[in-house]
Amino acid sequence: MPLDAAVKKSIMAEYATSEGDTGSPEVQVAMLTQRIRDLTEHLKTHQHDHHSRRGLLLLVGQRRNLLKYMAKKDINRYRSIIERLGIRR
């Protein structure tokens, strides 16, 4: 389930490190988190949608790898994004 353009723009505006930033780890993690939340809501009503469940697991793995990278490169940015997104790690 792709994100709407308006949702993407609001996420980019909130988590961008500079003007026009679309690829920083913070923005990528925030986008993945929103998609994960949307898919989680979808799976609450469609429990037997195994294709979407697999997609959810892939997204969680991508986010985990990005967070691992952030923790290795700059622990303060990692802690900041974890707190801002409200995800436990």
UniProtKB/Swiss-Prot annotation:
Taxonomic superkingdom:
Bacteria
List the GO molecular function terms: rRNA binding; structural constituent of ribosome
Q: Which Pfam families does the record match to this protein?
A: Ribosomal_S15
Output a single Gene Ontology CC term carried by this record.
cytosolic small ribosomal subunit
Query: Looking at the keywords, is Transmembrane present?
Result: no
Q: Which controlled-vocabulary keywords does the entry list?
A: Ribonucleoprotein, Ribosomal protein, RNA-binding, rRNA-binding
Q: One GO biological process from the UniProt record?
A: translation
Q: What does this protein do?
A: One of the primary rRNA binding proteins, it binds directly to 16S rRNA where it helps nucleate assembly of the platform of the 30S subunit by binding and bridging several RNA helices of the 16S rRNA. Forms an intersubunit bridge (bridge B4) with the 23S rRNA of the 50S subunit in the ribosome.
Q: Which NCBIfam families match?
A: S15_bact
Protein name as catalogued: Small ribosomal subunit protein uS15
User: What is the scientific name of the source organism?
Assistant: Kineococcus radiotolerans (strain ATCC BAA-149 / DSM 14245 / SRS30216)
The gene for this chain is rpsO
